[in-house]
């Protein structure tokens, strides 16, 4: 199920993410991706309280892979918008993408402890709630005009640059 259906869901989510990125502005795309990924954790919580079934497992895998791929495409679009300096684009992108891995690297070890202490249902509810700071950050960036500033075209380098 994971390799067949999961791969298909990831590919479909990647295409859907591309359509979202092209069809919506970056601010709206970021909100959509954040809420979809937050919601996909609740699908895991639902699975934790349902009787074991291949249908539910398939649904959870499709939901996670589809929303994860959308989030990845939108995140890459956001990083690309941030990295607009013609002189340092590759360096900026490498540093930002490496920084994005910090959370999943350091949170994975204590996550097992939390799951053992709370059970799978509450673990996934808590993991959903951990997205709230990201939503607050998105709101803060939006209130400061961050996304509008990224959307403004930047000039090309001149001889003085």
Task: Write out the residue ranges for each language-model feature.
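A late C-terminal transmembrane helix in Major Facilitator Superfamily
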Residues: 86-116
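C-terminal ends and interior cores of transmembrane alpha-helices
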Residues: 35-52, 139
């Amino acid at each position: 199920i994971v390799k067949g259906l999961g791969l298909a869901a990831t590919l479909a989510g990647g295409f859907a993410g591309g359509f979202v990125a092209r069809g919506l502005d970056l601010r709206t795309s970021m909100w959509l991706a954040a809420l979809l990924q937050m919601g996909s954790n609740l699908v895991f919580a639902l699975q934790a309280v349902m009787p074991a079934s291949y249908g539910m497992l398939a649904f959870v895998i499709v939901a996670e892979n589809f929303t994860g791929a959308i989030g990845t495409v939108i995140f890459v679009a956001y990083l690309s918008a941030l990295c607009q300096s013609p002189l340092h684009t590759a360096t900026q992108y490498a540093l930002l993408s490496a920084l994005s891995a910090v959370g999943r690297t350091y949170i994975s070890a204590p996550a097992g402890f939390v799951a053992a202490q709370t059970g799978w249902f509450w673990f996934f509810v808590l993991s959903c709630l951990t997205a709230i700071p990201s939503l607050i950050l998105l709101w803060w960036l939006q209130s400061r005009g961050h996304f509008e500033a990224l959307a403004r075209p930047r000039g090309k380098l001149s001889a003085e640059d």
